Each structure stands twice: as C-alpha cells, then as structure tokens.
Amino acid sequence: MRTATLYRFRLPMEAGVILRYQRLKTRDGFLVHLQENGQQGWGEIAPLPEFSKETVEQAGEAAVAWLRLWHLGAEPDESELPSVAFGISCALAELQGNLPEEADYRKAPLCNGDPDELIVRLNNMSGQKVAKVKIGLYEAVRDGMVVNVLLEAVPDLSLRLDANRSWSRAKADSFAKYVNPDYRNRIAFLEEPCQTSQQSLAFARDTGIAIAWDESVRDEGFNVEAQAGVTAIVIKPTLTGSLARCCQLISAAHNVGLEAVISSSIETSFGLTQLARIAHWLTPATIPGLDTLELIQSQLVRRWPGSTMPVTRLDELAIAWRS
C-alpha cells in the first residue's frame, strides 16, 4: 500500500538576501513523504524565485497531481517542473534505497564582507582551499581588485567566481585587467561572465580565465561538449530537474573531461543534506557549492552537521495534501 503526504514550509530568510530584482524574505516550499511496503522516502520541492520557471503554487499543484496518481499505484512520468521532478525523484530514491547515506559536507565558502577578515578566514581553512565569490553586483573593476587581493594574500587559494551573465564583454575585460595574469590559473572557473555564450568563450580564450556553464546548462538545446576555455558545468538540481537528468549531465561532463559541480539553489538544511549525499555519490572528487545554509534563519527537520541554528520540526509544518 502506498501513502503520500505533502508538507508546506515557510522559513524566514536573513535580511539582505537579494535575488536579481527582489529581496527574498522567506524560503517557501514543500517536503514530500512517500511510504510503501514499510519503506519511506523524502524530498524537498522549493522553486527559487527569479530563477525557477515555476512558482511555489504551481509546484504544489503539480506535486499533488503526481502524488494522487502514485498513491493509486501508477508510475507517473516526471513532472515538467524542475523543482517538482527533483524533489520527487529524491523521495523515490530514498524509498527505493538508491540514495546513499554517505555525504560530502565540505563547502566552498561564499566570500562576502570585509576582505581583511576574509583573508584571515581563508588562510585558516584546512584542507583544499576552494572558495566562491559572487561578482557582477558591483563595478567590474572593483570585483577584479577584490579577486586579485584574495589570490595574492592566500597563495594556495582556488576561487570559483559567479557573474550570472551580468557583464558585457567590455565590462568582463575591465574585470580581467585588474587580475594579475600570474594568478589567473587559480581561478578554477568563472561562471557565465558575459551575456552570451559566444562572448564568454571569447573572454576565456583572450584572458586565459577558465569559465563554467551554469544558466546555459538549463537552456533548451544545451549539449555538454569539450570547448576551449571551459572547465566545468554547474548543476543546480532544484533548477535542473530529476536525479536522472542530473546523472545524465554529470556523466556527459565527465566523459568529455569537464568537472561537474553540484550547487545549491538556497535549499533548506533538509535539501542541502540531500545535495551533500548526491555530491558524495556522483561527484566525489569535487567540492560541492553548498554554502547557503546560513541565509535561512532556521534549519528544517534534518540538521546540517555541526550547525547550531534552530530547527523547525515536522510537526510545526502544515499539511498541504495527504493521501
């Protein structure tokens, strides 16, 4: 016998979290719980405003439609909404024992705030020093100077940069001008520096700064291929789709010599712990990009190891639908 429950959550965000054009005040979504033959599985469905094509309401409706069919014994097709497809596929993988428990809780820390404090923190990091800097929010020249200072001050640091397609080619060149050519090989990659993929490829060729595809991975017709200057693809499962789709992309990337990086879409601690398990399972040699836990004021049901943040319990959540 199959039973299914959909729980709704709304967690307060820390002040100052801005996504493109709006301030994000709460993180909204659903936990899906599947039970069959004494086994159970869970997943998180949490479309990200400004980035997901679906709203939370649309995701909830699609999840209920899928759960109704599954509860009656059908094997419904994957939802066309990426956040729903991903969350349900995680629940099915747990239910069927296909999602390993071991996890990669390493994080590439997100660098923001006072550069002097950052340098101290980065120098004190143990193990492989990989960090991330969001760029493109301020002047390109300023971004270049900050990146250069970090690379100069921490000699064993490797940086992942993310520009979210925010620059013209001229602005991207302004950034590169302020990064010492001797340090550029320690930029692991710069995600989508320019507004078009052609401009980004030309930027990589002309500057020697490696790039990665992020938004492009979710564009219709995207093919994983080896290209000069491209070193990685970034996979954000909540925005991409089911585990099967993520596996397909990771396999294709590895087959052509590209790194595949599992990255957060500001999931709750519940979703982040599942992403850490997926990263350990599918991309064990790569540090995932999961340093977003502290953007939300509370954890959700499952704790992130070592975090002392308060936890919202399952019995505090509203039931959106139950079979």
From Swiss-Prot:
Pfam family, one: MR_MLE_C
Pathway info: Quinol/quinone metabolism; 1,4-dihydroxy-2-naphthoate biosynthesis; 1,4-dihydroxy-2-naphthoate from chorismate: step 4/7; Quinol/quinone metabolism; menaquinone biosynthesis
Requisite cofactors: a divalent metal cation
MF (Gene Ontology): magnesium ion binding; O-succinylbenzoate synthase activity
Binding site for Mg(2+): 162, 191, 214
Ribonucleoprotein among keywords: no
HAMAP family xrefs: MenC_1
Similarity comment: Belongs to the mandelate racemase/muconate lactonizing enzyme family. MenC type 1 subfamily.
UniProt protein name: o-succinylbenzoate synthase
Taxonomic path: Bacteria, Pseudomonadati, Pseudomonadota, Gammaproteobacteria, Enterobacterales
